[in-house]
Amino acid sequence: MGSCGGKHTGKGAPKPYSRNFTDPWRKTPGRLFGTALIRFYQITLSSLIGNSCRHLPTCSEYAYEAIARHGLWRGGWMGFFRVVRCGPFGTHGFDPVPRELSPDLKWYMPWRYWRCSASRTGK
């Protein structure tokens, strides 16, 4: 009689925990580069800075998901503006990445990504 060793198999097996976006996404070179930079930050510098983010998901988790969902250009701007909003006089609370972006968010107008969040777009 064999021992299962505490490992689950089959459909009822729990997914391993990941702090980052785990849904399937297109693995383009830009997205891979951007998410690798975010992951490098999470592994190295994030532990030195400490848990100081005022949002959920954290700013690095938000940037990772934004880049994975919307690409390096759009997701990078969304992540940048999220970090800017995280300051002492900025926003706080639950602020997820929108599943879809509004058609009026053009690539050549990155300042419009300033207030881009799922709570504002309703998606």
Curated annotation (Swiss-Prot):
GO terms under cellular component: plasma membrane
InterPro entries in alphabetical order: Membr_insert_effic_factor_YidD
Main location as per UniProt: membrane
Organism: Brucella ovis (strain ATCC 25840 / 63/290 / NCTC 10512)
Family: Belongs to the UPF0161 family.
Mode of membrane association: Peripheral membrane protein
Locations listed in the record: Cell inner membrane
The protein's name in its UniProt record: Putative membrane protein insertion efficiency factor
Keywords: Cell inner membrane, Cell membrane, Membrane
HAMAP family recorded: UPF0161_YidD (MF_00386)
Role according to the record: Could be involved in insertion of integral membrane proteins into the membrane.
Region annotation (Disordered) ranges: 1-23
